[in-house]
Regions:
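Hydrophobic, small-residue-rich alpha-helical packing segments that form membrane-like cores
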Residues: 1-63
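Electropositive phosphate-/nucleotide-binding environments in soluble metabolic enzymes
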Residues: 2-9, 48-51, 72, 104-111, ...
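Short, solvent-exposed amphipathic alpha-helical segments in soluble enzyme
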Residues: 7-9, 38-40, 80-84, 109-111
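His/Asp/Glu-enriched, well-ordered alpha-helical/loop segment
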Residues: 17-20, 82-134
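Active-site neighborhood of phospho(di)ester-bond hydrolases with catalytic His/Asp-centered motifs
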Residues: 25-26, 45-46, 66-68, 94-96, ...
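Active-site glycine- and acidic-residue-rich loops that bind
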Residues: 28, 67-76
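Short, charged, surface-exposed secondary-structure boundary motifs
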Residues: 54-59, 75-78, 103-104
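Polyanionic/metal-chelating signatures
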Residues: 59, 63-71, 87-91, 105-107
Length: 134
């Protein structure tokens, strides 16, 4: 293991020891590293950039937070494969990471995400569950 990864694992251990929630930011971890981080206490991650990555994280037990902001727009690329695979979406959330004010004014905020999911064929109740409940 490299020193940076060892430091990540130590920070997870420290966070768990303080009875805090461990939120993930792990864009370049291998599957064994993901499994190790989940076993150490990580419970969410918002670094899946495609459907295969999102599905792998879900199958490993991670709560997947799909980014749909101004910089990262991963909703369609990540959610559609999850839906096509018939996977449970109770551990899927959509987050507006790095959403610029001008984009909120132009497109909307939560409503834009729900409209996007509806345009993908997601039933309204499931879109509401993914966006607001999960």
């Amino acid at each position: 293991m490299d020193a940076e990864y060892d430091q990540l694992l130590q920070s997870i251990d420290d966070t768990v020891a303080m009875h805090k929630s461990v939120q993930g930011h792990m864009p370049a971890v291998t599957h064994p590293q993901l499994m190790e981080c989940l076993a150490a206490g990580l419970n969410t991650d918002h670094e899946a950039f495609d459907g295969a990555d999102a599905i792998a994280r879900l199958r490993a037990g991670c709560h997947v937070m799909i980014r749909e902001g101004s910089v990262a727009r991963s909703l369609k690329d990540c959610l559609q494969p999850i839906l096509d695979a018939g996977m449970d979406t109770s551990r899927v959330s959509i987050i507006t990471d790095d959403l610029h004010t001008v984009d909120v004014v132009r497109r909307g905020h939560m409503d834009d995400i729900v409209r996007t999911m509806l345009s993908m064929g997601v039933p309204l109740c499931k879109a509401i569950q993914i966006r607001f409940i999960s």
